[in-house]
């Protein structure tokens, strides 16, 4: 009996600390935390992982990790497949046949480097903000469930399963700005699929390609697949604007649990936390911007991270003031955009502004 009790005690205390959700807060190892960091985005666009490609950008990746750690940050968002330029492996008919034999080892090498710097990594799988030469690969996954299932079976689940015990894996971002390819202005008797509220909003800038239902299914199926192999995984979507991320203010939340399940039918295929991007237009934020509201104004029941922003498109706000706003107005994280764009020093000043803060969530913590 004593040995059994000790074994149970060891198992319960030896569990790996992970990011988790508590109401509208993010927790790590039982403590309320705030995700403070930046978008690496990429070093070599769409060619950073797999086919031994990580070695080419390794020094830049690790320099970013070092900078963020030294300025008090704790997390990085980085892009993976984008539109399928180099990963995963596709056949001539658009089905995913697998991943090359270095994709997981490349990702793991990056995660190990991040762990040495106490930084959580969030991999963004796909990108909806552009439509480029290999978009036909992503398009197949969006419109054909057989092709989407081939990606899930032969790439996504093997990746998620192989990396689930990596301490630096913060979570999975299914798609960057799906609204870039949404069909705005569509009427539907199902509110989840009605996009009339996006008419004239700028949504669909890369092409009016997919219905809200197709986007929701794409997210729902992948979120469910990740959780099937890793029930504790954190999943999000990098939404372009609060107009698609809240039911408040006359908008509609395309990524609510109800709408994602309605679109794809998989009960577990929901988000762990919301993520929104915000930039000014003609030096002004839209009235729906998170930099004009406290988190509570959006009436969401899950945490929200401001996943892209920067001083250069911040309506006159400094990087420091933007991080301060996100931290003190109820949000759960702030990732400035990006290492590949605009002033890195400006971004680092914003990250440093929150260094060692604990009053609205712990910013520095060990992995």
From Swiss-Prot:
Superkingdom in the source lineage: Eukaryota
Residues of the active site:
177, 308
> Which GO MF term does the entry hold, naming one?
mannan endo-1,4-beta-mannosidase activity
Q: Which InterPro entries match?
A: Glycoside_hydrolase_SF (IPR017853)
Q: Note the pH dependence of activity.
A: Optimum pH is 5.2.
As given in the record, the signal peptide range reads 1-17
Q: Subunit composition?
A: Monomer.
Report what the protein is called: Mannan endo-1,4-beta-mannosidase
Organism of derivation: Mytilus edulis (Blue mussel)
